[in-house]
Amino acid sequence: MIKREFLPESAELKIKLTADSKKWAEFYQKAEQKQAAKVSLRGFRKGKVPLEKARAYLNPQAVFELALRMFLPELEKQAATNIIDSDNVIESPIFNIVNMDKNNLEIEFLYPVYPEIKLPDYKNLKTKFAIKKITKEDIELQKQKLLEAKGRFIEVNRPVKIGDVINFNFKGFIDDEPFDGGEGENFDLRIGSNSFIAGFEEQLVGLEIKKEADIYVTFPENYQVHTYANKKARFRVKINKIKENQPAKLTNEFVASLKIQNVETISQLEVYLENLTERENIERAKIDFQKNALTEIGEQVEVPLAKKLINLEIERLNEVFHSTLKQQEIPLKEYLKITKFTEKDIYDQFEVEAKKLLKNSFIFAEIAKLEGLVPTQQEYESHVEKLAKFTGKSVQEISETVSYNEIQINITNQKVIDKLIEFNHETKDEEIVNKNQNDNEIEQDKEQKDNNEEKIKQENNLENK
């Protein structure tokens, strides 16, 4: 007997079946015989103990599990014949045992299906796509970053200022007790980089070399070591050295030394930096919009998630986590010691993140379905070429290592974001498109332009290292 039932609250199709009792009995007997072959009794050669005598030494649970393992592929195949296209099954099932004894087996298969989703009015979100307008101050800041990146650091004997790189010692206390990871010597820090928790670097400003001082901070609520979250701490600090940045001088010769195509004078550099800043602002606006738009939509919609999908996503996150630890050569035990986490804490975090990622993926998929957003072959090939260029691999290598579906999903998601921007923006459509174009782009090909911009970004990032 087979019974189908759709479970909308968990986005699953349940197919319950009663196995043929004769077949189940046969598999149970085979399992008994396999387990009996492992029994050793005095007077019998190994594997030759009669089943009647071996039964007394068998683990009934092990026999049932083996019998089920052998029978399961056939049962799953039988259940699958009762699936129709309109069920929208998207993954293989998990199963539950309803009833099982030596003579009878009832089992149910739970297939993840595409969930029922009722989206809010995503065409009129409160979240709007807005590009920050460029000011003269923005261009001056870009120039200053570039000059500082090309400058040099010299030791000075004066109080600490914003922008200095200091070498210092520190020791942290919580409730007047030292804590793990709260101590360091000869540590280099650029003041203003926000590398430490809020308030720490600001209190270093004004301190002098060789003098000790106390700094008081509060660990943030989301601090990675959760046992320190929201805790007040005192740091005893001592400045060893102070280095001041002496920026390079902005001249036409300096600009020429950057070797940026079609940029040889100060005025050309300013135009170039303006174009670069525009593109950065667009990218930043897209990132902010995507985050806030998904949050707004997500708060207004419930997306039922099948347990199998959640488990698979947790497994993926766990694999990424352990791979990262391995790359950084950090044993799991050491990580747990440093962060004060338990393995259950980590699993719980993965579960929350898995549900969030799955929910967002279905929101993307539903909007794509409603708007008819389907990647073209040209978009696929262009995406593969970009991945190849970014990773330094060939197009063929990318095609072989990154699945077709994964690339299609990435393209579709970007099309969804573009469509949401089209619906929810504070800038005219043509302005959004034209922001990506400028005089320099017309004069130089796309590849060279990207290389130039990456060069500028790298120069600007040097100062933060």
UniProtKB/Swiss-Prot annotation:
Transmembrane segments: none
Chain segments carrying region Disordered: 431-465
Cross-referenced PROSITE patterns: FKBP_PPIASE (PS50059)
GO process terms (BP): cell division; protein folding; protein transport
GO cellular component: cytoplasm
Pfam families cross-referenced by the UniProt entry: FKBP_C, Trigger_C, Trigger_N
Reactions listed under catalytic activity: [protein]-peptidylproline (omega=180) = [protein]-peptidylproline (omega=0)
Function: Involved in protein export. Acts as a chaperone by maintaining the newly synthesized protein in an open conformation. Functions as a peptidyl-prolyl cis-trans isomerase.
Name of the protein this chain belongs to: Trigger factor
Organism (species): Mesomycoplasma hyopneumoniae (strain 232)
Source taxonomy: Bacteria, Bacillati, Mycoplasmatota, Mycoplasmoidales, Metamycoplasmataceae
